[in-house]
């Protein structure tokens, strides 16, 4: 298939589908990125099974989660901020959606579809970075200069798309205008 799916999915596409929220926490033009620890809590926190966290723990990733069935992307972003990153007082933008599809690794000849919800987050000015035990590292990085090969899970593509479409966070509950 070389085109997007027809309107109105009635079942998951044969090549698979992911619906994810990404939380882009920024401070002074730097983005908070993490490296996964091989911690079983990832399954409950973000739907990240052992094979994926072991395979991708070497590189930088944007804090993210698969949405739970029926979960609002805004709630998923808050779950990332509060449960995964543990940042109190984080301010969130409204989500922006992006779609991607590419050859499926699990089903040769089929396409895998991704629906991404991008949410920007601004921590309180007095926030000091603390690394939860399910990360080996959390760090402020400049997404414009970080080399693509240092990202894991294809997150260099996610960050590139975010940079092309990002908005400014102006406060909790305030709709941010996308460019």
PLM feature spans:
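Acidic, metal-coordinating catalytic segment for phosphate/diphosphate chemistry
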Residues: 1-24, 28, 36-41
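Conserved Nudix-box catalytic region and its N-terminal flanking loop in Nudix hydrolases
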Residues: 27-87
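NUDIX/MutT-family hydrolases
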Residues: 58, 116-118, 127-162
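Charged phosphate-binding loop/patch that engages nucleotide di/tri-phosphates or the phosphate backbone
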Residues: 154-179
């Amino acid at each position: 298939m070389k085109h997007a799916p027809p309107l109105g999915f009635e079942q998951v596409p044969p090549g698979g589908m992911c619906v994810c929220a990404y939380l882009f926490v920024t401070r002074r033009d730097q983005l908070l990125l993490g490296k996964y620890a091989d911690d079983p809590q990832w399954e409950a926190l973000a739907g990240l099974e052992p094979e994926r966290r072991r395979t991708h723990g070497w590189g930088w990733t944007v804090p993210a989660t698969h949405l739970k069935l029926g979960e609002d992307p805004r709630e998923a972003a808050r779950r990332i901020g509060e449960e995964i990153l543990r940042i109190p007082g984080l301010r969130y933008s409204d989500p922006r959606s992006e779609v991607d599809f590419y050859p499926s690794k699990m089903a040769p000849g089929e396409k895998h579809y991704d629906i991404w919800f991008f949410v920007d987050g601004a921590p309180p000015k007095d926030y000091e970075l603390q690394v939860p035990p399910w990360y080996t590292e959390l760090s402020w990085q400049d997404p414009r200069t970080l080399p693509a090969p240092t990202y894991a899970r294809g997150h260099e593509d996610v960050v590139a798309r975010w940079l092309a479409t990002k908005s400014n966070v102006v406060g909790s509950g305030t709709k941010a205008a996308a460019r």
